[in-house]
């Protein structure tokens, strides 16, 4: 029986051998299809391929956000410790690569640490990684960090700083947070 790492390697090789650009793969993945673990793993391999081939950053960011819109939980929940280790390393690598151009990578990395298993959970990463995402202009993190600062969640409370950050928000997320 093949290991998860071997199966993922085969998926990656098949995607690369297709000769199609990553953007051609993106539309076939939907929230419904990503509930299936095999589809999610394939989508992660497509995301890596997009990063390897320098696909358009906005398209890659949007695809990354889609595959990590809670669908990763369906994949990792049944993994044993060895499989989880591979999953963790792969997810962290992809988050790091996306974080080079998008705050979405930093925010997802922080979220992964806050939800991790097998001794990897570490809440101390959540706020700093979200703050990096906010500093990169990732709208969801900008609003979240403002709120956390104001309330003192995951960081030292600083109402003044929270209010300053709220006042600077211009995104639709700011409206959701009650600006």
Residue ranges with predicted function:
Residues 37, 76-85, 100, 117-122, ...:
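Short coil/turn and helix-start
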Residues 26, 59-66, 105, 141:
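The tetratricopeptide repeat
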Residues 50, 98, 132-133, 169:
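Canonical positions in the second alpha-helix
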Residues 55-56, 74, 100-103, 115-117, ...:
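Short helix-capping/linker turns of helical repeat alpha-solenoids
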Residues 29, 66-76, 106-115, 144-151:
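Hydrophobic face of amphipathic alpha-helices that form TPR/SEL1-like repeat modules
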Residues 160-173:
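TPR/TPR-like (Sel1-like) alpha-helical repeat modules
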């Amino acid at each position: 029986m093949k290991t998860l790492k071997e199966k993922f390697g085969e998926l990656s090789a098949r995607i690369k051998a297709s000769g199609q650009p990553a953007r051609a793969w993106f539309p076939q993945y939907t929230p419904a299809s990503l509930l299936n673990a095999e589809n999610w793993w394939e989508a992660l391999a497509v995301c890596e391929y997009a990063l390897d081939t320098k696909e358009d950053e906005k398209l890659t960011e949007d695809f990354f956000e889609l595959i990590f819109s809670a669908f990763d939980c369906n994949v990792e929940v049944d993994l044993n410790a060895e499989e989880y280790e591979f999953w963790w390393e792969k997810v962290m690598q992809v988050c790091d690569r996306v974080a080079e151009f998008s705050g979405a990578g930093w925010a997802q990395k922080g979220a992964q640490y806050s939800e991790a298993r097998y001794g990897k959970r570490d809440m101390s990463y959540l706020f700093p990684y979200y703050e990096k995402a906010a500093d990169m202009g990732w709208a969801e993190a900008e609003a979240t960090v403002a709120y956390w600062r104001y309330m003192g969640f995951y960081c030292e409370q600083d109402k003044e700083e929270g209010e300053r950050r709220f006042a600077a928000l211009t995104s639709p997320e700011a409206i959701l947070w009650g600006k």
